[in-house]
Structure formats: structure tokens, C-alpha cells
């Protein structure tokens, strides 16, 4: 089988957008207190929409992904950790079972190296790396961001051989927020207060001529129609729509939908009309915390 340059697969279609909205239990400080065990998934005893972003260190989100009649066809994990005084985040996704067999057990690894900005409120990536393993073949992309010179460099390798590199200017007063930076910054209110009816435009790393993601939290009237169609009862939930150009993820509409708890944790995520597969679904399985998260990326070569 010959290796083709990376094209986003259905698993990552869900994860890239889902990273915008995973919002968990927030408080000041750098650690998580004990949480009551009787709360439903997606709700926490205490919630605040902003604070020191380093409070997320040690957190891992576990996600199950299904499509058609294949339940839990793939899994994903998102985590934040500190090592030697530097803060990193990783996203890992891989297919399993029969779907894994069909996709050569495809695996995606993302890693961001962060600087802490704005008095601890925002992360800004100095490096963003992506590695894809399909069977025995690998592709890796590195992005370097220098905000002193306002320059973005990128390098792409296939099986250890460089096949592409380039650079572009970073506009002043703009941050190229990769998916992991967006993940934590959105949770911390960097892009604006989270309210029903609100719209957001988020600058991201340019790819295929696209450098922005559009986000809309539906207003109560819009949400009511969807609640009726899907038999949902909780009016405190949020329904979020993300529009990503359909060419990026090979969908018919480019539309991604998220049902979120009142604490902004996605309960269900849907990629609409993925070509040949129909709708794809992701669900939050659980959240764990561990102050010693220093694993995973070294073993796949993202150092």
C-alpha cells in the first residue's frame, strides 16, 4: 500500500471540532479537589468560566466514537501535563476492532508545546506537532511559531524523509491557535463569554486556505426545535454548531453539532453526513486526573 499525504479521517473530524468545547470543572489554583460521586456526567459541584488556565494540568478526557452500527469503533484521549517547567498537551486517537482492521489501525498523535500568556489566562503554542501512523507507515508535521519575528514555519516528513517545508507571516495581534490551544482557551473564556445566541470567529493554523473556524451557540428558540426532534428535556443544555469548510473533512455540509451540559461539557457530538458513512457520533466516557502525566508522546517520537 502506498502512503498518501495526510487527509483528516472521520475520527479526527469529530475530535478537532470537539476540542473547542470540552469544558470541565473549573476553580482557581493548579489542582482539582475531590468531586461528589452522585453528580451526572457533564455536571460538577462548582463551576466558573475563567481563571488560571494551569488548573487543567493533570486532566485527561476519554472519548468513545461510533458510526453506523459500529459502537466504540475508535477511542481518543486529550490531556494536559507539565514536565521540566514546560506545559504540553496531547491528543491521541486510534481505531480498534473490525474498524481498526479496515483502517490499518490508523493512529493520530497531536502535541502542543505551550507558553502561558495574559497573566495565566491563555495558552499560546510555540510548537504544534502531528504524527499519523497507518499500518507501518508514518507521516509527521511540525509547526513552529515565533511571535517575536511573527513567523510560522512548517515541516512535513514521510517515513523520516522531509517532503515539504515553508513559512508564512503571522499577522500582528493574531495567534495561530491550533486545536489543542483552542481547546483550553475556549474553556477559559478567551474567545468571549459563553451564552446562547453567541457567535465566535477563531483564528487557527492555516490549512488548505482556511484560517478561521466559525462557532454558533444556538439561541433558545433554535435549540427548542432540536430538543423536540431528539426528545431532549434539559433546557439548561447548550446546542453548539461549528461550521468548518466541507473540503477539510470531506463532509456534505461541513456542519458539526454538540449537545453540551450546563457546565459546557459535550454530552454528544455529531459530524453530519460524512461521505459514505452518514452521521458520526462521539460521547464523553469519563474524565480522570493525574498529577504525574508525563507519558505517551515520548513513545511515538514527538519530543
Model-derived regions, located:
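Cleavable N-terminal signal peptides
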Residues: 17-18, 29-31
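Bacterial N-terminal signal peptides that target proteins for export
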Residues: 3-15
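Acidic, serine/threonine-rich low-complexity disordered tracts
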Residues: 32-147, 192-303
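Membrane-interface motif at the C-terminal end of an N-terminal transmembrane signal
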Residues: 23-29
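Bacterial N-terminal signal peptides
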Residues: 13-23
